[in-house]
Amino acid sequence: MSRVPSPPPPAEMSSGPVAESWCYTQIKVVKFSYMWTINNFSFCREEMGEVIKSSTFSSGANDKLKWCLRVNPKGLDEESKDYLSLYLLLVSCPKSEVRAKFKFSILNAKGEETKAMESQRAYRFVQGKDWGFKKFIRRDFLLDEANGLLPDDKLTLFCEVSVVQDSVNISGQNTMNMVKVPECRLSDELGGLWENSRFTDCCLCVAGQEFQAHKAILAARSPVFSAMFEHEMEESKKNRVEIKDVEPDVFKEMMCFIYTGKASNLDKMADDLLAAADKYALERLKVMCEEALCSNLSVENAAEILILADLHSADQLKTQAVDFINYHASDVMETSGWKSMVVSHPHLVAEAYRSLASAQCPFLGPPRKRLKQS
């Protein structure tokens, strides 16, 4: 009977991460063998389909599974009449079923295994069920004395059986010192400073509303704020900054980005937020707005987005808008936005025409390239 091996130490199981707890599953397999010798084999007069059975055998005295070998000396049926058929039969079983693999071979005059055949998987046995090989070996080859498979007219069959038994789980806790590094919460913590107005040292005034902020954070994130506070400007002396041309809700979203690197409402105000990001040199936020606007390009708004991109030097957005217009040229040129742009921004109309004229091949579909973020 196979022995359940001790599991390897958890640290040796893998060169990858080490878990706090582990489980090692061992599938128990009982292996045993059986040898069956048939004397005077050449005198077997059984007809096709007739059977010779061995005595029963098991893995040991306490094993209630009983097996036997079954031979059809002249084959099982018409298809195998020129062969010896060999099967493993489950004679008795206290369980509803068992699974087992098996290997058959013939021992030659030297006691060596020859003509071995093995099951490719563990088969399901129930009591009275057999599995094996209908064409185990050709009769003419077996009976040919030159092949030495019937010394003294004895056929010796050797069978190895592997019976699958229950699985065993061994589990435990890792004894190694585990150091758990907490996730970085810098974004949330800085966002908390903004939301709670703690330890502020400057005031930002937007359309009559006042917002408390931190000069160091503003200066670190925005070159424009940095210039305000670094030089002897009025904003630096009074610690008060007047924010113009930005609506309060857009300003709050911009400040959320400055403190956390996130802008959860960006899709709702991408156009206005693009203008604010451009004004305060927030390059990553600017490209995030460009990407959001690109994903919402349509025939109706293509001209307006092209104007917006040109106004705020949003080069990637501008390229995407021009490409979109080229692809949908006939439809876009019928919109009120395009007709208005012809009057207000003729240079953009010229750029769009130049791009259309220089196109070497038609577009396969509307451009939706992912933008590069700073």
Curated annotation (Swiss-Prot):
Any one GO molecular-function label of the UniProt entry: ubiquitin protein ligase binding
Sequence segments annotated as region (Homodimerization): 297-355
BTB domain residues: 173-297
Assigned keywords, A-Z: Nucleus, Ubl conjugation pathway
PROSITE patterns assigned to the protein according to its UniProt record, in alphabetical order: BTB, MATH
Domain (MATH): residue spans on this chain: 31-161
SMART domains per UniProt: BTB, MATH
CDD domains from the UniProt entry: BACK_SPOP, BTB_POZ_SPOP-like, MATH_SPOP
UniProt cross-references to InterPro entries, sorted A to Z: BACK_BPM_SPOP, BTB/POZ_dom, MATH/TRAF_dom, SKP1/BTB/POZ_sf, SPOP_C, TRAF-like
Pfam families according to UniProt: BACK_BPM_SPOP, BTB, MATH_2
Main location: nucleus
Cellular compartments annotated: Nucleus; Nucleus speckle
Annotated metabolic or biological route of this protein: Protein modification; protein ubiquitination
GO biological process, one term: protein ubiquitination
Region Required for nuclear localization, residue ranges: 71-191
GO CC annotation terms, alphabetical: Cul3-RING ubiquitin ligase complex; cytoplasm; nuclear speck; nucleus
Subunit structure: Homodimer. Part of cullin-RING-based BCR (BTB-CUL3-RBX1) E3 ubiquitin-protein ligase complexes that contain CUL3 and SPOP, plus a target protein.
Family classification: Belongs to the Tdpoz family.
Reported function: Component of a cullin-RING-based BCR (BTB-CUL3-RBX1) E3 ubiquitin-protein ligase complex that mediates the ubiquitination of target proteins, leading most often to their proteasomal degradation.
PANTHER family in UniProt: SPECKLE-TYPE POZ PROTEIN (PTHR24413)
Domain remark in the UniProt entry: The BTB (POZ) domain mediates dimerization and interaction with CUL3. The MATH domain mediates interaction with protein-ubiquitin ligase substrates.
Protein name: Speckle-type POZ protein B
Lineage start: Eukaryota, Metazoa, Chordata, Craniata, Vertebrata
The encoding gene: spop-b
